[in-house]
């Protein structure tokens, strides 16, 4: 008599399902145990199904107060039918985070656009400006007449590099030293659709240099978008402190660089969440112009939980 293979297969399937369920429960318990000695999180009780996403978010470098507030919102608003499903919890949490991130789309109207890049030293302002210049002047969808002004008279090497970029791209470039000459430089480039302005890297504590930058803005005679350039590799406390130091310049958008040089991105999320300032671009490498992508909340949230890859950036 031949063995009943159908019955045996069914038993094997049943055992496999039980093992899968058991493994999932063990995973949930493990995620709960990892933080058992932590503070009581303001009496926020994290159910087992939420533990995995909580752990990932906390390890990402996100400020704990932000994480707790978002987790509380998730607990209060997630439908009861979804709370017992870790996959549904994760999906809802992702969606909530995406909706909390303001992103500024590229403006494609006919008005002239003037962008000034400001920020601390070493964040890649000059390279980012070169990427923007190539993007606007030689973009696939539309090409704009693009001009460059540099106010960075302190770093001779950076100025020479920018002049080389401008020469290669056949773009007009002017260097300005005195505040009084700034308005005239903008007028000289009045035929341009886009004017990009490079500035000296400034410490947020150097009030004298920052006030000089403010004078350039006030004597420009033009509407200038101030873009604060920051590195994704900085600690969240430093990012927020730098932002506060530059905030009197009335920052329009953020540009976040060096995505390829870090593994955690919760700090970037917390910066945008706390300041409620739109982010416009992410710089994801050194290549000009390819390694600059328009900011999208989906991309940043994926980086927060799953890390950064060049493939993700190219998919954008």
Which residues make up each language-model segment?
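Conserved C-terminal guanine-recognition region of P-loop GTPase G domains, centered on the G4
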Residues: 130, 165-167, 185-189, 206-276
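Short hydrophobic/aromatic beta-strand immediately N-terminal to the Walker A/P-loop
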Residues: 114-116
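Pre-Walker A adenine-sensing motif
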Residues: 96-109
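NTP-binding/hydrolysis catalytic cores, primarily Walker-type P-loop NTPases
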Residues: 268, 272-316
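Hydrophobic positions on the alpha1 helix immediately C-terminal to the Walker A/P-loop
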Residues: 128, 132, 161
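Switch II (G3) loop of P-loop NTPases
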Residues: 118-123, 146-157, 164-182, 189-212, ...
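Post-Walker A helix-loop "phosphate-sensing" segment adjacent to the P-loop in P-loop NTPases
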Residues: 135-146, 171
């Amino acid at each position: 008599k031949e063995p009943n293979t159908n019955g045996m297969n069914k038993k094997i399937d049943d055992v496999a399902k039980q093992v899968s369920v058991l493994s999932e429960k063990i995973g949930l318990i493990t995620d709960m145990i990892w933080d058992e000695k932590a503070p009581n999180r303001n009496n926020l009780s994290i159910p087992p199904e939420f533990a995995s996403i909580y752990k990932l978010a906390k390890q990402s470098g996100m400020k704990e107060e932000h994480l707790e507030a978002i987790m509380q919102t998730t607990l209060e608003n997630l439908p009861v039918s979804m709370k017992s499903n870790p996959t549904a919890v994760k999906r809802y949490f992702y969606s909530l985070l995406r909706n909390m991130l303001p992103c500024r789309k590229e403006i494609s109207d006919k008005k002239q656009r003037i962008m000034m890049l400001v920020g601390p030293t070493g964040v890649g302002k000059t390279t980012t400006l070169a990427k923007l210049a190539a993007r606007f002047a030689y973009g696939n969808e539309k090409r704009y007449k693009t001009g460059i002004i540099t106010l960075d008279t302190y770093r001779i090497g950076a100025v020479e590099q920018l002049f080389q970029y401008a020469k290669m791209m056949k773009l007009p470039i002017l260097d300005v030293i005195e505040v009084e000459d700034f308005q005239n430089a903008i007028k000289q480039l009045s035929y341009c659709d886009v004017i990009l302005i490079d500035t000296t890297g400034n410490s947020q504590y150097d009030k004298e240099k920052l006030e000089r930058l403010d004078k350039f803005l006030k004597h420009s005679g033009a509407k200038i978008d101030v873009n604060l350039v920051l590195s994704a590799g900085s600690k969240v406390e430093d990012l927020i402190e730098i932002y506060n130091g530059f905030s009197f310049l009335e920052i329009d958008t953020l540009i976040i660089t060096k995505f390829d040089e870090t593994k955690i991105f919760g700090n970037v999320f917390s910066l945008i969440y706390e300041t409620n300032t739109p982010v416009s671009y992410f710089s994801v490498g050194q290549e000009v112009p390819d390694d600059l992508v328009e900011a999208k909340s989906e991309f940043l949230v994926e980086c927060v939980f799953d890390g950064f890859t060049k493939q993700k950036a190219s998919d954008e």
